[in-house]
Amino acid sequence: MEQEVYTALTFVELTTVHYQHDDPFGLFNAYVTLIPIAIAIGVITLILFRRDVRTISIFLGLLFSECTNYVLKKSIKEHRPTMWKELRKQSYGMPSSHSQFMFFFAVLMTLFYLKKRIRFGSKILPIISVTFLFFLAAGVAYSRVHLYYHTAKQVFCGSFIGICLGFIWYGVIEYIFRPYLFPIIINHPIGKYFYLRDSSEIEDLLNFEYTNVMNKVKTINKTKPIKTK
């Protein structure tokens, strides 16, 4: 007769979302609450393919926000709501890291647009983009309360801290990194080896890249020898 062996299991809290099976909006909010992970993956992808130092600084800002949240949680030690007893054992809830992440990112992107560090081809598109970012941030914040991962107070504090850190990190990028650190990085042999660049001064980056690529393609096509049968 085989002996049954039971092993205690745990989970990766970052990607695991619990919700009540009879909640009609539970699955939707579970997906909404994962938006910060999608944004982080998107930023990393941009870094790998664009090699822009400002994008790298945005990612560093997200790490700065997360580290700040970790320190605050360990210092405050306020538990999550009592709905899920197992979640209370995993980590603390004050402040909400998801809410902090989203509002940090939304504020930072908005400030970049207002300073014209991010340019769009139309006037209405940036307004829609900024509004959509804050809509997502509010949606993520609500999902944390709806899924009983945080209290309303924890979400509010996380959102407020994210907004404050967004302003602070924008100042770090604009007044320290961009004038002093970025030129050193992009002109350093290591920076050149990895093709690091700063494209923040280009008026319309999308149009600039499109025009240059198309001109290069035309030049290549003109120099190609004509094949004859």
Curated annotation (Swiss-Prot):
Membrane topology, record value:
Multi-pass membrane protein
Pathway assigned to this chain's UniProt record: Protein modification; protein glycosylation
Record's superkingdom? Eukaryota
GO biological process assignments: protein N-linked glycosylation
Query: What Pfam families does this protein's entry cite?
Result: PAP2
* Keyword Plastid included in the entry's annotation: no
- Give TM segment ranges: 27-47, 94-114, 120-140, 156-176
Task: Tell me its EC number(s), please.
Answer: 3.6.1.43
GO cellular component terms, A-Z: endoplasmic reticulum membrane
- Under which main EC class is this enzyme filed? hydrolase
Q: Which Gene Ontology molecular-function terms are recorded? A: dolichyldiphosphatase activity
Q: So what does this one do? A: Required for efficient N-glycosylation. Necessary for maintaining optimal levels of dolichol-linked oligosaccharides. Hydrolyzes dolichyl pyrophosphate at a very high rate and dolichyl monophosphate at a much lower rate. Does not act on phosphatidate.
Name the PANTHER family on file: DOLICHYLDIPHOSPHATASE 1 (PTHR11247:SF1), PALMITOYL-PROTEIN THIOESTERASE/DOLICHYLDIPHOSPHATASE 1 (PTHR11247)
Q: Which family does it belong to?
A: Belongs to the dolichyldiphosphatase family.
Name of the protein in question: Dolichyldiphosphatase 1
Q: What would be the name of the gene that encodes this protein?
A: dolpp1
